[in-house]
Amino acid sequence: MARVTVEDCLDNVDNRFELVMLATKRARQLATGGKEPKVAWENDKPTVVALREIASGLVDENVVQQEDIVEDEPLFAAFDDEANTEAL
C-alpha cells in the first residue's frame, strides 16, 4: 500500500490543524472499537487507517462528530431517594 501524505489529506481538510484534530478523533474511535473502519484495515495502526479514510474523502468532521443515540435508562434511575432522605 502507498503511504498517506499530508498533501493527500489536505485535499479534503482546510488546514493542518484541522487535519490533526480530525485524524486524532477518528483514530480514537477506531482504536476503542466505537466505529468501524471505512477502508480496509490491512494490518495498519488506527492513526494510519484514519488518515487513509480522510485522504479518500470518506471521513470528515460531520462523520466524526456523529454520536450513536443509545436508549438508556433515565439518568437518575438508580438514585435511591430513601437513602438520601435518611441522611438528612
Curated annotation (Swiss-Prot):
Gene3D superfamilies, A to Z: 3.90.940.10
Superkingdom of this protein's organism: Bacteria
GO CC, one annotated term: cytosolic DNA-directed RNA polymerase complex
Record's keyword annotation contains Transferase: yes
EC numbers, comma separated: 2.7.7.6
Keyword field contains Transmembrane helix: no
Reaction it catalyzes: RNA(n) + a ribonucleoside 5'-triphosphate = RNA(n+1) + diphosphate
Biological processes annotated in GO: DNA-templated transcription initiation
UniProt xrefs under SUPFAM superfamilies: RPB6/omega subunit-like (SSF63562)
Keywords, ordered alphabetically: DNA-directed RNA polymerase, Nucleotidyltransferase, Transcription, Transferase
A molecular function (GO) term: DNA-directed RNA polymerase activity
Enzyme class: transferase
Family designation: Belongs to the RNA polymerase subunit omega family.
Quaternary structure and interacting proteins, as annotated: The RNAP catalytic core consists of 2 alpha, 1 beta, 1 beta' and 1 omega subunit. When a sigma factor is associated with the core the holoenzyme is formed, which can initiate transcription.
Task of the protein: Promotes RNA polymerase assembly. Latches the N- and C-terminal regions of the beta' subunit thereby facilitating its interaction with the beta and alpha subunits.
Name the UniProt record assigns to this protein: DNA-directed RNA polymerase subunit omega
The organism of origin for this protein: Pseudomonas aeruginosa (strain ATCC 15692 / DSM 22644 / CIP 104116 / JCM 14847 / LMG 12228 / 1C / PRS 101 / PAO1)
